Amino acid sequence: MRIVVLAGGLSTEREVSISSGTLVAEALRSKGHEVVLLDVFMGYEENICDIDALFKQNYSFTDGNSIGDDVENTITNIKEAKEKRLDKTSRYIGRNVIEICAEADITFLALHGGEGENGQLQATLDLFGIKYTGSGYLGSALAMNKGLTKSVFMQKNINTPSGELYKNEKDALAWNMFPCIVKPCSGGSSVGVSKVENADQYKKAVKEALKYEDEIVVEQFVTGREFSVGLIGGKALPPIEIAPKSGMYDYAAKYQAGATVETCPADIDEETDKKLRDAATEAYEALHLESYARIDFLLDKGGFTYCLEANTLPGMTPTSLLPQEAAVEGISSVSYTHLRAHETDSYL
């Protein structure tokens, strides 16, 4: 197959996306596919004489083969990317990206956050008739916006921490229940997320979250164990328990090797396992998700589950959760990536 892997972008998860994209491209090439790895924002700025040649040479915008070299030599800073791009317009999709994707059998979305995950890119690809991995524009939009996600969960009677959506600092000051969690409405990888214990901490956390987005979500803090349940083709995988060695499960805990103890399959009884998988399936269906996703949960001391949020384009880095869950089912990361590119669930 001829496959385009899209990575990079302009979200706060740009660096993680580049790492995911590099891994995905390597896995697909190991299966014999012709793979072009593109930065969706930077695009391919040279004049294209022969798109076929890009596939045959397995073009990569990172100009390297190893993961470490790829990421090290790639623009990971958003400001630097904007300055380097020749096209100075506000367009999210870089030059020649659509044209190259149109010549592929499928486009593998290794993007995280922002326009690459919130449904905008998905809708654009739909309009051009370009096949891609992951959920469509509707599910992507619902899952990316934490305020909308919470509303859907409440309408479908899926238990979730109580919370509010705020569009400015003044309105956010109405919140008076502590401890609580403050987070950007559509961010990922826990960037800009804070746990606060009192009003003074809360004001600082609100300012911090608003640096990243114009809307924030504030919700009750629930004490409990944290789990994540991946789904492939609507089938829930074994839950994985996430236990940071210190503090919250923040950006550093997610991507720094050894910062978090991740146990899969989780050390839980059959009843709890079923409860988490069933809740994940309900959330997956309620948000109109497709293909694959990951749903995050908290489990309190009473055994009550709280559905936190959904991730429509789970990471593919060495520390990513969904590949670990798939491995428990006997699906290697290479096989998982290969089969996602084929959009088949025949291995389940």
Put a short name on every predicted segment.
Residues 220, 229-231, 284-316, 326:
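Conserved metal-phosphate-binding beta-hairpin within the catalytic cores
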